[in-house]
UniProtKB/Swiss-Prot annotation:
Family matches, as InterPro entries: GlpG_N_sf (IPR038236), Peptidase_S54_GlpG_N (IPR022732), Peptidase_S54_rhomboid_dom (IPR022764), Rhomboid-like_sf (IPR035952), Rhomboid_protease_GlpG (IPR023662)
This protein's UniProt keywords: Cell inner membrane, Cell membrane, Membrane, Transmembrane, Transmembrane helix
Organism of origin: Cronobacter sakazakii (strain ATCC BAA-894) (Enterobacter sakazakii)
Full protein name: Rhomboid protease GlpG homolog
A GO-annotated cellular component: plasma membrane
Signal peptide as annotated in the record: none
Localization of this protein: Cell inner membrane
């Protein structure tokens, strides 16, 4: 086998592999510290390298964006080596993504052992004027999850969305998006329902908005959200707004998060186009 190229961005690697599959060339991705592209049929090496040169110069070309659909399957020509579960989790995420997951788990365990009321008193939004200078309280409600289902749901989506964003755009952008959403969403929740709220839901929806819109407007960023997932998240938001899960007030935080994500993505893509 012949190694063709190594990618830091797995989405770019998959886009190239999917496109070559539509051209009748089967490539294999082997995932280590980078995503390495391997070719079994070395007789096609020159053709693949020529295509690679064009791909690296024009990663946003529509031919690559539609390749997965043309093949009729989402993993056309794509074969991964199996790696331990935790290694796969780490490979998909950066330090901020993993750190937030760890803190949420620790907070949930503390709530289970010490008791939810006590931990909530430590981490809740400032519920008394004397607490307004305890600055961590404007962010720490993100760590509070009041059910195991809520924790699992939010952490899975956080990992799925925040990981690629951090790897593609950087930890700074993820931190900014998280802090802005925590502050704005917290103010909204406090005004509507008081200080006793928590969870990553608002940030998850900010990530949905950001990843989707930036991926649509700037494909070369390496960000991409399948439209099926976008539709699912919007339906979930609508169902929550009807109060079918018993907490309509939390929906304001989710809507605010989505709008923040969309606004930040629009701002970033406009700035990127001006620089060009």
């Amino acid at each position: 086998m012949l190694m063709i190229n190594s990618f830091d961005n797995p989405r770019l690697a998959q886009a190239f592999v999917d496109y070559m599959a539509t051209q009748g060339v089967i490539l294999e991705i082997q995932r280590h510290d980078t995503w390495d592209i391997w070719l079994a049929d070395e007789a096609q090496a020159e053709r693949v390298k020529a295509e690679l040169s064009y791909f690296l110069a024009h990663p946003g070309d529509p031919r690559y964006l539609s390749a997965s659909w043309q093949t009729g399957q989402l993993n056309a020509g794509l074969r991964y080596r199996s790696y331990p579960f935790m290694a796969s989790v780490r490979a998909h995420a950066g330090p901020l993504t993993l750190g937030m997951m760890a803190l949420c788990v620790v907070a949930y365990l503390a709530m289970s052992i010490i008791g939810s009321p006590q931990v909530a008193v430590w981490l809740a939004w400032p519920f008394d004027p004397s607490l307004k200078f305890q600055l961590w309280r404007y962010v720490s409600p993100l760590l509070l999850h009041f059910s195991l289902l809520s924790l699992i749901f939010n952490l899975l989506w956080w990992w799925y969305l925040a990981g690629p964003l951090e790897r593609s755009v950087g930890s700074g952008k993820l931190l900014t998006l998280t802090l802005v959403t925590a502050l704005v969403g917290g103010v909204i929740q406090y005004q509507i329902a008081g200080p006793w709220f928590g969870g990553l839901g608002g940030v998850v929806y900010a990530l949905v908005g950001y990843v989707w819109l930036r991926g649509e407007r700037e494909p070369e960023s390496g960000l991409y959200l399948p439209r099926g997932i976008l539709v699912f998240m919007l339906l979930w938001l609508a169902i929550g707004g009807l109060g079918l899960f018993g907490n309509k007030t939390a929906n304001a935080d989710l809507v605010a998060g989505m709008l923040i994500g969309l606004a930040m993505a629009m701002t970033d893509t406009l700035h990127a186009r001006k620089r060009k």
